[in-house]
Every structure is written in structure tokens, then in C-alpha cells.
């Protein structure tokens, strides 16, 4: 339940978490917290930067999947509920739109349970997990240090396809 600079809950986040959480109905109230968070912080590409904290994004009342996940983690940790950051991909029929995605997992009923705040869903049958960690920096796809002058560029390409059992058996 360690907080990081990106997932530290400030007063407004703690108040928000406590408003929607009921210990006697943990799973139901976490589902409600997820839905209310998305209403409070609509998906808004470009609203934040990767270094923005949960508190920064929550104060702006908008963000992307990384921000939704950081705020949800901050809420869970403020409530003393173990939670972790997950990064990966989500399958989409639109092959042109393949981008990293983030969601949370909460230790609930003796196992890690998913919460995709951006899509307001617990069914992750189209998600591909790449990494887990305390926050984005713990689970980001590329991270490093470079010494020296000159410019640099990093180009990546990802493809997420639906897996067919029938194709696997042939």
C-alpha cells in the first residue's frame, strides 16, 4: 500500500474516496468509486503529462487512463486497500488505434481483481497485460537514461490481434 509521488492522495482525493467507500460493501463501493471517478474526470487526451500526479489530474478534473488509474490507486491506498498499476494494451477492431493502456488491480476476495476506470469496466477479456507496479513509472514500457549530445527518436509499432482457438489447434 505504498504511495508514490504519482499516487499520493491529497485532501480532495481522500474526501472523494471516503464519500463513495463503504467497508461492509467493499466490492460494490469500489465499483461505484470507479464509475464516479470517470464522471468526475472525463477522458481528455492531452489534458495531462506523464509526470503529473494523481492530485494534479484530480484538480484538473480530466485526464487519460494513466491519470484515472493513479487517482483510483490513490483512493484505494488512502482507504488502506492494496492496489497496483497495470499497463498493457486493449484489443480494438480499429487496428489504426493501438496505444498503451492502464488500469488498476485491487486485492479483493483473496485475489487481484481488475478495474479499468477509463472504460468503466471490470471485464477485461480484451486486455493484454505487460507490466504491473506501484505507478506508471514502475510499469512504463520504456525507461532509461541517455548521456551525450545529439538528438534521438524512438519509434515503436504494436499490433494487438484477437486470438482464435480454432487457429491455434491447426
Predicted regions located by residue number:
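Secondary-structure boundary elements
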Residues: 1-63, 71, 136, 147-167
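Hydrophobic/aromatic-rich core segments of domains that either
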Residues: 35, 67-150
Amino acid at each position: 500500500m505504498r504511495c508514490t509521488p504519482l499516487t499520493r492522495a491529497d485532501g480532495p482525493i481522500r474526501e472523494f474516496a471516503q464519500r463513495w467507500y463503504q467497508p461492509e460493501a467493499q466490492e460494490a463501493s469500489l465499483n461505484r468509486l470507479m464509475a464516479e471517478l470517470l464522471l468526475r474526470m472525463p477522458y481528455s487526451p492531452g489534458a495531462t503529462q506523464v509526470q503529473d500526479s494523481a492530485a494534479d489530474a484530480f484538480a484538473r478534473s480530466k485526464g487519460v487512463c494513466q491519470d484515472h488509474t493513479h487517482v483510483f490507486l490513490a483512493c484505494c491506498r488512502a482507504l488502506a486497500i492494496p492496489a497496483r498499476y497495470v499497463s498493457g494494451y486493449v484489443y480494438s477492431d480499429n487496428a489504426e488505434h493501438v496505444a498503451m493502456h492502464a488500469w488498476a488491480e485491487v486485492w479483493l476476495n483473496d485475489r487481484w481483481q481488475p478495474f479499468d476506470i477509463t472504460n468503466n469496466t471490470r471485464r477485461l477479456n480484451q486486455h493484454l497485460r505487460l507490466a504491473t507496479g506501484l505507478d506508471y513509472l514502475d510499469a512504463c514500457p520504456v525507461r532509461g537514461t541517455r548521456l551525450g549530445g545529439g538528438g534521438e527518436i524512438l519509434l515503436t509499432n504494436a499490433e494487438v490481434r484477437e486470438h482464435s482457438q480454432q487457429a491455434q489447434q491447426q
